[in-house]
């Protein structure tokens, strides 16, 4: 399965001294305080931390969806803080994929059309988008469900379509925020297995926020957040 290639002597994503505060009423609340994290090509990393610790904020900043108050996000070794919005958007479309706890599929579109959409936005021909969408959905065991709309799919199938959509543009890194959080344990296990198989097949890097220590234990590294900083777990 096609996957973008790049230099492997620098991290795909590197967070350097990331700081982020929010206002709680009129009181500033520090979420991230000098956080550092390197994510290497083909590496899967679990971010395990309590609710409210800043997991989603870290993922959003790493994925260029949110700007830090200070610090720098490097993508493929290049700083991104001074990029124009249009270039940041283009970088998200080409190098970064997202999977959320809620699948966020477009209800009026079929599974195939949902996976085609990011490719069409990027400018790929329809025939190429159809071919790649079918390939990914087939790899995830959904080859016979491509014409079904989200409401006609089970929860696990919906999330697998969301995963297929996230990797449709062959990103270099995938961010997943509690991707199995809404699923029962059996379905969550199947979805997670499919996700890990796809990650290994494409050598995409992945940072996944999860409460599930058993699933986190299957990944290459485990990190947490403590006092606004990233710490490695055994």
Swiss-Prot record:
ABC transporter domain segment(s): 13-233
One family from Pfam that matches here is ABC_tran
Which PROSITE patterns does the entry link to?
ABC_TRANSPORTER_1 (PS00211), ABC_TRANSPORTER_2 (PS50893), LOLD (PS51244)
Q: Which InterPro entries match?
A: AAA+_ATPase, ABC_transporter-like_ATP-bd, ABC_transporter-like_CS, ABC_transpr_LolD-like, MacB-like_ATP-bd, P-loop_NTPase
* Keywords of the record: ATP-binding, Cell inner membrane, Cell membrane, Membrane, Nucleotide-binding, Translocase, Transport
In the record, biological process GO terms are: lipoprotein localization to outer membrane; protein localization to outer membrane; transmembrane transport
What domain of life does the UniProt record list for this protein's source? Bacteria
Q: Which SMART domains match?
A: AAA
Q: Which residues are listed for ATP binding in this entry?
A: 49-56
Q: What is the protein's known function? A: Part of the ABC transporter complex LolCDE involved in the translocation of mature outer membrane-directed lipoproteins, from the inner membrane to the periplasmic chaperone, LolA. Responsible for the formation of the LolA-lipoprotein complex in an ATP-dependent manner.
What is the name listed in the Swiss-Prot or TrEMBL entry for this protein?
Lipoprotein-releasing system ATP-binding protein LolD
Report the source organism.
Answer: Bradyrhizobium diazoefficiens (strain JCM 10833 / BCRC 13528 / IAM 13628 / NBRC 14792 / USDA 110)
């Amino acid at each position: 399965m096609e996957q973008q290639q790049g230099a492997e002597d620098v991290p795909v994503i590197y967070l350097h001294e990331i700081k982020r505060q929010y206002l709680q009423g009129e009181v500033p609340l520090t979420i991230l305080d000098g956080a550092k994290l390197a994510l290497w090509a083909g590496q899967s990393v679990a971010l395990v931390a309590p609710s409210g610790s800043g997991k989603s904020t870290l993922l959003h900043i790493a994925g260029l969806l949110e700007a830090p108050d200070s610090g720098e996000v490097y993508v493929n070794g290049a700083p991104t803080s001074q990029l124009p919005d249009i270039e940041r958007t283009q970088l998200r479309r080409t190098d970064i994929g997202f999977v959320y706890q809620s699948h966020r599929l477009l209800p009026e579109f079929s599974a195939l059309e949902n996976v085609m959409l990011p490719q069409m936005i990027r400018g790929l021909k329809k025939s190429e988008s159809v071919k790649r969408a079918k390939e990914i959905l087939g790899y995830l065991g959904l080859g016979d469900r491509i014409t079904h709309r989200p409401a006609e799919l089970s929860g696990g199938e919906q999330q697998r379509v969301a995963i297929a959509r996230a990797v449709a543009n062959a990103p270099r890194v995938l961010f997943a925020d509690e991707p199995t959080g809404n699923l029962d344990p059996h379905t969550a296990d199947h979805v997670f297995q499919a996700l890990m198989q796809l990650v290994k097949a494409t050598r995409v890097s992945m940072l996944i926020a999860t409460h599930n220590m058993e699933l986190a234990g299957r990944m290459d590294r485990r990190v947490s957040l403590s006092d606004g900083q990233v710490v490695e777990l055994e």
